[in-house]
């Protein structure tokens, strides 16, 4: 059995779990998330705990048990506390600001880059060079952060660009004769 999949998920106050028609849905103060349940995984909800079991003894069922448990744990955490990624803009004249739901970035191009936020994801700019991306869906938050970073990834010589706050950019030395 999967070691990750065996661990039960404790449901915090304010989180409701519903399993119906092969779909697991979690509702909480920050919204509702749903995930289809694979046919090789059984889901049990009892006494504010969520447990997963493989439907048969195959390796695939064991692997999917751990995967489904990890996805469900992320859903429960997302609807109760949420997820966030912090990005830093490093470079002269690099700045970010919000325009409604869109993020306006000045990244050294001849034009401003405007990134529309998908539904369920919010952006904040505490300072001109910091971006906070928040949401209930871990996958969406990470995807939006990766898309914003991709506009101008950190370059290896001066380190200019958009980087995650916990990212270390290893600088190269310039070529010398």
UniProtKB/Swiss-Prot annotation:
<dbReference type="Pfam" id="PF00347">
    <property type="entry name" value="Ribosomal_L6"/>
</dbReference>
<dbReference type="InterPro" id="IPR000702">
    <property type="entry name" value="Ribosomal_uL6-like"/>
</dbReference>
<protein>
    <recommendedName>
        <fullName>Large ribosomal subunit protein uL6</fullName>
    </recommendedName>
</protein>
<comment type="subunit">
    <text>Part of the 50S ribosomal subunit.</text>
</comment>
<keyword id="KW-0694">RNA-binding</keyword>
<dbReference type="InterPro" id="IPR019906">
    <property type="entry name" value="Ribosomal_uL6_bac-type"/>
</dbReference>
<keyword id="KW-0687">Ribonucleoprotein</keyword>
<dbReference type="GO" id="GO:0003735">
    <property type="term" value="F:structural constituent of ribosome"/>
</dbReference>
<dbReference type="GO" id="GO:0002181">
    <property type="term" value="P:cytoplasmic translation"/>
</dbReference>
<dbReference type="InterPro" id="IPR002358">
    <property type="entry name" value="Ribosomal_uL6_CS"/>
</dbReference>
<keyword id="KW-0699">rRNA-binding</keyword>
<comment type="similarity">
    <text>Belongs to the universal ribosomal protein uL6 family.</text>
</comment>
<dbReference type="InterPro" id="IPR020040">
    <property type="entry name" value="Ribosomal_uL6_a/b-dom"/>
</dbReference>
<keyword id="KW-0689">Ribosomal protein</keyword>
<dbReference type="GO" id="GO:0019843">
    <property type="term" value="F:rRNA binding"/>
</dbReference>
<dbReference type="InterPro" id="IPR036789">
    <property type="entry name" value="Ribosomal_uL6-like_a/b-dom_sf"/>
</dbReference>
<comment type="function">
    <text>This protein binds to the 23S rRNA, and is important in its secondary structure. It is located near the subunit interface in the base of the L7/L12 stalk, and near the tRNA binding site of the peptidyltransferase center.</text>
</comment>
<dbReference type="GO" id="GO:0022625">
    <property type="term" value="C:cytosolic large ribosomal subunit"/>
</dbReference>
């Amino acid at each position: 059995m999967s070691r990750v999949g065996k661990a039960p998920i404790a449901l915090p106050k304010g989180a409701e779990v519903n399993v119906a028609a092969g779909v697991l849905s979690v509702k909480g103060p920050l919204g509702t998330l749903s995930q289809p349940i694979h046919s090789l995984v059984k889901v049990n909800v009892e006494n504010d705990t969520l447990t997963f079991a493989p439907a048969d003894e195959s390796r695939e069922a064991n692997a999917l048990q751990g995967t489904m448990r990890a996805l469900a744990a992320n859903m429960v955490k997302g609807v109760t506390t949420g997820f966030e990624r912090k990005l830093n803009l490093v470079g002269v004249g690099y700045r970010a600001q919000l325009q409604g739901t869109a993020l306006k970035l000045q990244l050294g191009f001849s034009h401003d880059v405007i990134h529309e936020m998908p539904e369920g994801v919010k952006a904040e700019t505490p300072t001109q060079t910091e971006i906070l991306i928040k949401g209930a869906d871990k996958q969406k938050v990470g995807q939006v952060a990766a898309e914003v970073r991709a506009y101008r990834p950190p370059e290896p010589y001066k380190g200019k660009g958009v980087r995650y706050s916990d990212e270390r950019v290893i600088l190269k030395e310039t070529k010398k004769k």
